Amino acid sequence: MLKAVILIGGPQKGTRFRPLSFEVPKPLFPVAGVPMVQHHIEACSKVPNLKEILLIGFYQPNEALSSFLLKAQQEFKVAIRYLQEYSALGTGGGIYHFRDQILSGGPQAFFVMNADVCSAFPLVPMLDFHKQHGGSQSYVILGTTANRSQSLNYGCIVANGETQEVLHYVEKPGTFVSDIINCGIYLFSPSIFQHIAEVFQRNQQELQLEENSSWQRTEVIRLEQDVFTTLAGRGKLYVYKTEGCWSQIKSAGSAIYASRLYLSQYGSTHPERLASTKEGGPTIRGNVYIHPTANVDPSAVLGPNVSIGMGVTVGAGVRIRESIVLHGAVLQDHSCVLNTIVGWDSTVGRWARVEGTPSDPNPNDPYSKIDSETLFREGKLTPSITILGCNVSIPAEVVILNSIVLPHKELSRSFKNQIIL
C-alpha cells in the first residue's frame, strides 16, 4: 500500500502570490482551469495501490477547502484528508508531527510533494526507480537540470553518475555546486522518520542549552537543510532525474507559465478540456481552456495559453493571449488582455487594453527556469505580468500596463508600472 502527502503551507506563506491569495488559499488557485493542487491529486490517483492522500498545512479549515476535498474525493475515488498544523513546522516538521496518521495502515512507501510546483509528476517511474535502488531503506528525490546561474536559487544535488546516489546536497548554495536541482517531490520509506527523529532530538538538546527557548522550535524541521544534507553520501538517498516539464509557482506571474505547461500536457492527458475553433464559436489559437459556463462571443480571438473561468463573459472583438481570466469576470467589447491575470468578478471596459510583461524562462536555453524576480529593482517596479485583484473595475478606453491592482478598486484613468493600493 502507498500514500501521498501534499504540503500546502498556510496563509503566512505564499505572500508573493498576493493579491490573488487574498481571496482563495494559494493551493486552490485555478491553473489551467482546475485548482493548483488538483493536478497533484490527479497524478496520485493514477498510481496503482495508492490508498490515501493527506494534505498538511496550517490554513484554518474553511468552506472552500472542505468542498474542494469532498469533490476531489468523489471524482478521483481516493481517500483525501486535511491535517492542520498548529503552526508552521517546516517541510519535515509537518510530516513528523503527523507521522502516526501517515504510517497508519502500514504503507510500504509514501510520496511527499510541495503544492506550489507544476510538473508532469512521473510518480510511477519514481516508484520503479525506488524499488531498484534499495526499496525500504532508500529515499528518492525528483531532480531536473537547471542552468548554472539559476541553480543557485534551488536545492542542488551532486549525484554519482552511475548509481544516481546523492553524494552531496546543498540548499540554495552561495557558489555553483551542481546543475541538478531538487523538484520538491520525494518518495520516502517509513524509515525516514528515524532520521527526522534524530534531527528532532538534536534540536531538543540544543534548546535545553538555551535560556527562554520555545518548545515549539524543536518541531520546526526542514527536510532540505536538516535531513537531506545529513543523509547525502550514506547510500540511502537517490535522485531520479526527469526531462519532463517542471516549474515552481511562487509568484503570481509564474501561474501563467504553469498554466501554459499544463495546457500543453492536456493535449495527451485531457484533450476534452481544450477548446477548438468551431463554426459559430470564437477563434481559438493554440491551447485554450474555456469553462462550460463561460459566455464567449463568436467574434473573440483567444489564445495561445488562455484559461477562462466559470461564468466569465467575453464580449465582441475581444483579444486574449497568455492570460488567466477568473470566474465572474466581464471583458467588454473590443478589450484586449495580454499577459494578465484578471481577478474574480472584475470588469475590463470597452476598448481598454490590459497588458503585462511575461516572466518566461529564456526560450533559447532548454534548462532555463522561471526567475523569481523581486518586486522592485533599483527603486523601480520590475516589469511583470499585470494582475487585477478581485472586483476591480477598469474603465473604457484606458491602458493598464505592467501594474498590480489590489482588490475592489475602481480605476478612472490609465496606469503603467504601478501598484495601485
From Swiss-Prot:
InterPro entries: GMPPB_C (IPR056729), Hexapep_transf_CS (IPR018357), Mannose-1P_guanyltransferase (IPR050486), NTP_transferase_dom (IPR005835), Nucleotide-diphossugar_trans (IPR029044). The keyword Disulfide bond does not apply. GO terms for cellular component: cytoplasm. GO terms for biological process: biosynthetic process. GDP-alpha-D-mannose binds at residues 85, 248. It holds the Pfam family NTP_transferase. GO terms for molecular function: transferase activity. It is found in: Cytoplasm. Component of the GMPPA-GMPPB mannose-1-phosphate guanylyltransferase complex composed of 4 gmppa subunits and 8 gmppb subunits; the complex is organized into three layers, a central layer made up of 2 gmppa dimers sandwiched between two layers each made up of 2 gmppb dimers. PANTHER family: SUGAR-1-PHOSPHATE GUANYL TRANSFERASE. Regulatory subunit of the GMPPA-GMPPB mannose-1-phosphate guanylyltransferase complex; reduces the catalytic activity of GMPPB when part of the complex. Mediates allosteric feedback inhibition of GMPPB catalytic activity upon binding GDP-alpha-D-mannose. Together with GMPPB regulates GDP-alpha-D-mannose levels. The N-terminal substrate-binding domain adopts a Rossman-like fold and has a binding pocket for GTP or GDP-alpha-D-mannose. The C-terminal domain consists of a series of tandem hexapeptide repeats that adopt a beta-helix conformation. The beta-helix forms several protein interaction surfaces involved in assembly of the GMPPA-GMPPB mannose-1-phosphate guanylyltransferase complex. A loop extending from the C-terminal domain (C-loop) is involved in interaction with other subunits of the GMPPA-GMPPB complex and may be involved in allosteric inhibition of gmppb catalytic activity by gmppa. This is Mannose-1-phosphate guanylyltransferase regulatory subunit alpha. It comes from Xenopus tropicalis.
